[in-house]
């Protein structure tokens, strides 16, 4: 008797390397799979070994860090994208298609576009990362394209999702009111969610400022030492910054338009840029 077996092998991962002079943002993906978020922090000159990284978490429990989590599949956390499809379907599962990277006319600036599509519906999403080398700044936004036969309703459409791994997270942000602007608030994040948000349209900075600092691996704020990540929304309007620490101590930061009363009907053939 002959017994034959075949081992299931994962598709080869493609590294998406976005970098400035001193920092790296690294993703990995294979066609038809979710885009995994591997690293944001100090620059990694050779990211190739990260292609084989596995978290050894159970995939059924939604514990892999993904680049742009959508409402659907096994995502149980706050989604970056939540839509109602033309046929009423609420499920969205984004899968990698391709990516391109090019240097813009200013050679200090590199633009990387990562293309995704829903596993079942004709809905496309592009993540656009623009890296400014000397300034050590990476901007990101999403472009949503409707190829379905009817309108798609957008409920949540954040500009970015950033998973971070550290032992502690100290959040610093500014708030205020008339005659007492720019008050400083420090919050040590615990498991669960915290949001900084505004629905005051163009008057957002009168109360909550759409920017933040995150001190990693420390519960005290210092202006002279430590690892700090800064983020800001580069536009005025209703916004929400959502900070969610999960059971594995991973912090996911969502930044973008406030989902409150923000539904948008995207007609067939139209695109929406966050």
Task: Explain the meaning of each model-derived region.
Residues 13-18, 23-26, 33-244, 260-262:
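Polysaccharide-binding surfaces and accessory modules of carbohydrate-active proteins
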Residues 248-260:
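Short, structured beta-strand/loop micro-motifs enriched in basic residues and often containing a Trp
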Residues 4-12:
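Boundary at the C-terminal end of the N-terminal hydrophobic targeting segment
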